[in-house]
């Protein structure tokens, strides 16, 4: 009976779609998808908040207030300067006109549509010197669409580099010159992309957290489970506020931490302890760096497994079977092992640089230890952690690499910049989108992952 109902719904959906002119179908699909993706999460959040407030009797709001909020969200999604219109414009322009050039102009126009909406977060009152003295004027900055642009650039580079490498492989195989080095590069390309991206992200998390989204900072903080006083000390070491062998009044910061974890107070004094002992970094798990790394792996594995397993079981519940259950458990275990190894390698890389490799290479002077704890040790952890992706299967490595790459690139660019430079971002987005959309039309398999399937579905007839 349920199969018949599902078939009837699918038939009704197809008949509804067939009433739309063939040329306009991709535009309608894109608009509906954009509208759903921009409004559904906010509606769900509103419902959950409303339900939570009712159950906990916290600031109970009238039902009509929640209804007005939901209506405002639904109406907001229909505005011209919102994401659904952006989706329809970019897809419509690329399907109604010639592929590459039309995609370029469609992308340019659609991004301009998003950029035209002013935001308080990108507006600041700045003092200007005029003939009549100083004047305070509101100045609008660009950068609202930077994440979208970097995502587009990343996918375009993946398409271009992937196509070049495929053509190169065909040519070299036909001439019998495909070497073991070429095979190794093919195998390690995605892991290297992930590892280098994670290195940038983890470096930014330590030293420039404002370059990462707030939610990203919060998630890494939860996964890493690091004492915030230790993070603060690392930043002060890098920027010269804490110096080994010099009294700067910063000893109480880590001495409080030492007291909490049962360590001697002198361990937290940069004058008495040069360098800080690794026990401080281990946060109460003992002196041995290898044991600390293993304990980090175990704790992170259990934390991740308790998150991944319920999600995978829910996904497997649609076709509940012994095989589906085993697959859910194995998938959860593999992903948890990946995350546990990531965190363990990060911490072990720090210890390896501080107590093993660093002193042998840079020396044991105060200046050398200052250099090690002022950034070199963090660099060691950043360089190692991302290679944990080798635990995942080949397809998953590519997906993870493409997921983190735009976020890593975002750490290299300012979150806000002057309006007069916005054309550069728009140009980068337009060119990148034109490349990706043209590739979807000509070689859809080249656009990897969920994005490739989604664009093929939206842009297809």
For the regions a language model picked out, list residue spans one by one.
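Glycine-rich, hydrophobic membrane-spanning regions of integral membrane proteins that mediate transport
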Residues: 1-461
């Amino acid at each position: 009976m349920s199969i018949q109902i599902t078939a009837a719904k699918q038939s009704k959906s197809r008949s509804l779609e067939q009433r739309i002119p063939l040329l306009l179908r991709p535009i309608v699909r894109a608009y509906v998808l954009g509208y759903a993706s921009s409004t559904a999460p906010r509606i769900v959040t509103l419902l959950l908040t409303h339900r939570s407030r009712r159950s906990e009797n916290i600031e109970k709001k009238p039902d009509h207030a929640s209804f007005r909020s939901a209506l405002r969200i639904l109406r907001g999604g229909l505005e011209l300067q919102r994401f659904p219109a952006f989706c329809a414009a970019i897809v419509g322009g690329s399907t109604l006109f010639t592929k590459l050039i039309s995609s370029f102009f469609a992308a340019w126009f659609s991004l301009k549509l998003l950029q035209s909406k002013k935001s308080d977060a990108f507006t600041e009152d700045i003092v200007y010197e005029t003939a009549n003295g100083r004047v305070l004027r509101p100045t609008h900055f660009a950068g609202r669409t930077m994440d979208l642009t970097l995502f587009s650039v990343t996918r375009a580079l993946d398409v271009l580099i992937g196509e070049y490498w495929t053509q190169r492989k065909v040519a070299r195989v036909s001439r019998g010159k495909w070497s073991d080095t070429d095979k190794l590069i093919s195998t390690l390309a995605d892991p290297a992309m992930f590892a280098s991206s994670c290195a940038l992200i983890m470096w930014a998390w330590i030293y420039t957290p404002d370059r990462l989204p707030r939610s990203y900072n919060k998630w890494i903080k939860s996964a890493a489970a690091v004492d915030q006083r230790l993070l603060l000390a690392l930043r002060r070491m890098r920027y010269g506020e804490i110096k080994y062998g010099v009294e700067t009044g910063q000893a109480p910061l880590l001495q409080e931490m030492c007291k909490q974890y049962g360590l001697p107070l002198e361990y937290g004094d940069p004058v008495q302890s040069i360098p800080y002992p690794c026990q401080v970094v281990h946060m109460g798990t003992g002196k041995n760096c290898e044991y600390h790394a293993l304990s980090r792996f175990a704790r992170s594995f259990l934390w991740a497994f308790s998150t991944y397993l319920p999600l995978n079981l829910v996904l497997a519940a649609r076709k509940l079977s012994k095989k589906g259950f085993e697959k859910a458990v194995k998938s959860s275990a593999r992903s948890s092992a990946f995350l546990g190894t990531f965190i363990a390698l990060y911490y072990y890389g720090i210890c390896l640089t501080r107590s093993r490799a660093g002193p042998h290479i840079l020396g044991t002077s105060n200046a050398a230890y200052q250099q090690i704890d002022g950034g070199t040790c963090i660099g060691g952890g950043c360089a190692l952690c991302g290679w944990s992706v080798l635990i995942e299967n080949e397809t998953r490595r590519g997906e993870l690499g493409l997921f983190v790459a735009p976020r890593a690139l975002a750490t290299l660019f300012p979150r806000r910049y002057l309006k007069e430079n916005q054309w550069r971002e728009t140009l980068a987005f337009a060119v990148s989108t034109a490349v990706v959309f043209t590739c979807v039309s000509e070689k859809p398999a080249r656009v990897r992952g969920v994005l490739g399937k989604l664009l093929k579905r939206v842009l297809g007839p």
